[in-house]
Each structure stands twice: as C-alpha cells, then as structure tokens.
C-alpha cells in the first residue's frame, strides 16, 4: 500500500507502441528477412520525488517483441536509480542512462553507456548502466566521479536482422 504522502509525488507514464519497418530494397546478405519487420514496444517512465525534492527514484523498463529478429526481442531496465541530494553534493545509485561524453567534430562520444544497436544503428538508444555517481557543486562548476561495477555488453542485430553488417556478431558464445 502506498501512503498518501508518497502517492502525491509518484507517477508512471506507460508507453505501448507498434512498429512496422519497411525495407524497399532486397536483403544484402543471406538469411535476412525480406521487406517488413513488425514489432511491439512496451515501456514507460516512473518517477517518485520527495516533498523536499532532495530524493528521487526513476524507473524506465524497456521490452521489445520483434516477430522476425530474435536478437531484437529483448528486455532492459534502462533506468532504476535513486538520487539523494545534500547541500552541495549528490549521490546517484542504480541503473542509469548518463548523457556525458567527449565532444568531437561530428558528435558527442558517450563513454559510460553502451548503445543498443538492435534498436537503431544511429547510436541514440542506450542501455542502462549500473553505476554509483558522486557529484559536487563548487564555485567553478560541477565535478562528478563515477564507479561502474561492471561493463555492459553492446547488443547487435541477429543474422535475420536487416540492420546488420556482413559479419554476424555471436555474443552468446
């Protein structure tokens, strides 16, 4: 049972989407499916913020069911994190997507999260990364220290997937 104090600051926005990809060209490699790729996405965003706004919990589940590419059918917790703010520093613990990187001429190179290649090859979809983050505000800016307890493997399309290259990535072996 959620108390009325907590319920006032608790929200969840579900998202269910059907997707139909159409590829007008014939497959480039043997084993790829033909022209249509239907799938269903289930996800959402849950948030809880304390009344003093010093505590926050975020939850973003992700489930894709693809009818043709088994590697694209997957579940991930993109975010399940707890943030505690103190006077001039904060602590983030959990699974999170961090938008932080090094600027290059073309774009920002993300150095924390792996990209979810089975979703898109444009490097916009990220996998959640287990981490601890300590952040401190100073007069000259903000400083952050990250601890990543382990490395998430990048995901790739399977042999049936249309957005794969000539070599098949077999990460199961």
Where are these regions (language model features)?
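Residue-level preference for beta-strand/loop junctions
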Residues: 8, 36-38, 74, 126
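Transmembrane beta-strand segments of Gram-negative outer membrane beta-barrel proteins
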Residues: 8-26, 55-59
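Histidine-anchored nucleotide/phosphate-binding helix
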Residues: 41-46
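Outer membrane beta-barrel
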Residues: 47-163
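Surface-exposed beta-loop-beta
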Residues: 162-173
């Amino acid at each position: 049972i959620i108390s009325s104090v907590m319920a006032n600051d608790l929200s969840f926005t579900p998202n269910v989407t059907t997707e139909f990809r159409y590829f007008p060209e014939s497959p480039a490699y043997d084993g790829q499916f033909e022209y249509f790729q239907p799938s269903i996405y289930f996800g959402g965003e849950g948030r809880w913020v304390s009344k003093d706004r010093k505590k926050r919990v975020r939850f973003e589940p992700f489930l894709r069911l693809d009818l043709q590419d088994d590697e694209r059918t997957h579940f991930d917790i993109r975010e399940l994190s707890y943030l505690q703010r103190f006077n001039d520093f904060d602590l983030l613990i959990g699974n999170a997507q961090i938008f932080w990187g090094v600027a290059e001429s073309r774009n920002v190179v993300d150095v924390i999260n792996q990209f979810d290649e089975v979703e898109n090859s444009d490097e916009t979809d990220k996998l959640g990364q287990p981490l601890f983050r300590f952040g401190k505000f100073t007069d000259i800016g903000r400083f952050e220290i990250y601890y990543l307890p382990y490395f998430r493997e990048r995901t790739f399309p399977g042999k049936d997937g249309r957005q794969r290259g000539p070599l098949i990535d077999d990460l199961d072996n």
